Regions:
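C-terminal output helix
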Residues: 107-116
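Conserved acidic carboxylate
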Residues: 9, 33
Length: 124
């Protein structure tokens, strides 16, 4: 598998873990550590998929997803929401904000890889 992934995550242990494992599988990984930087990186890098933490500094994940889906240059990029707050209704809230899929933390890496593959395939 290959493709470009934008990982918007503010916790170093999570972005370090995910970026290393994704790179080993042939993905190019672009990092952003807050929502505002995530929007800027999405516009600059035009990734195939965005992994978006919902609990971010500066601009939270919900607002980031809405901003990405409102902009013509990023609206078609699939977004997979990542959240530790796997509460009832969070999946619906993420989808309503513009996310295309949802993955609760802790990360189930094989499942996340399947979701990434599906998202990239849907974008073709």
């Amino acid at each position: 598998m290959s493709g470009k992934i934008l990982l918007v995550e503010d916790h170093e242990e999570i972005w370090d873990f995910l970026s290393r494992r994704l790179k080993r599988r042939g993905y190019e990984v672009v990092l952003a550590h807050d929502g505002e930087a995530g929007v800027q990186q999405a516009r600059a890098a035009q990734p195939d998929v965005i992994l978006l933490d919902m609990n971010l500094p500066i601009l939270d994940g919900w607002s980031t997803a809405r901003a990405l889906k409102a902009a013509t240059d990023t609206r078609a990029i699939p977004i997979i929401a990542l959240t530790a707050h796997a509460m009832s209704g969070d999946r619906d809230k993420a989808i309503q904000a513009g996310c295309d899929d949802y993955h609760p933390k802790p990360i189930d890496f094989p499942k996340l890889l399947t979701q990434i593959g599906t998202a990239i395939g849907a974008g073709d």
